[in-house]
Amino acid sequence: MKKLFASLAIAAVVAPVWAATQTVTLSVPGMTCSACPITVKKAISKVEGVSKVNVTFETREAVVTFDDAKTSVQKLTKATEDAGYPSSVKK
């Protein structure tokens, strides 16, 4: 029992170390006017774990920096889709 408790305690301390800040570029082709990036940025910014968002109308892209322990790319793309702007990871 003590070994189990010790293992869980170590895992709880080390788990945050496994989390990493990631940056992903999303393609958002549905942005058709200069006001669209504002909506996309607001939607992505509301996702927990997002630390930085830069949306560019000219390239129809959103560059997002986030904590992968708190959110995922799927949650980011869902946020843009829910705002009316489907997106995908730019290859």
Curated annotation (Swiss-Prot):
GO cellular component: periplasmic space
Pfam families on file: HMA
Residue ranges of every copy of the HMA domain listed in the record: 22-88
InterPro entries linked to this entry: Heavy-metal-associated_CS, HMA_dom, HMA_dom_sf, MerP, MerP/CopZ
Gene Ontology MF annotations: mercury ion binding; mercury ion transmembrane transporter activity
Signal peptide region: 1-19
Keyword Transmembrane helix in record: no
Sites where the protein binds Hg(2+): C33, C36
Transmembrane region(s): none
UniProt similarity note: Belongs to the MerP family.
Function: Involved in mercury resistance. Acts as a mercury scavenger that specifically binds to a mercuric ion in the periplasm and probably passes it to the cytoplasmic mercuric reductase MerA via the mercuric transport protein MerT.
Subunit structure: Monomer.
The protein's name in its UniProt record: Mercuric transport protein periplasmic component
Organism placement in taxonomy: Bacteria, Pseudomonadati, Pseudomonadota, Gammaproteobacteria, Enterobacterales
Gene name tied to this protein: merP
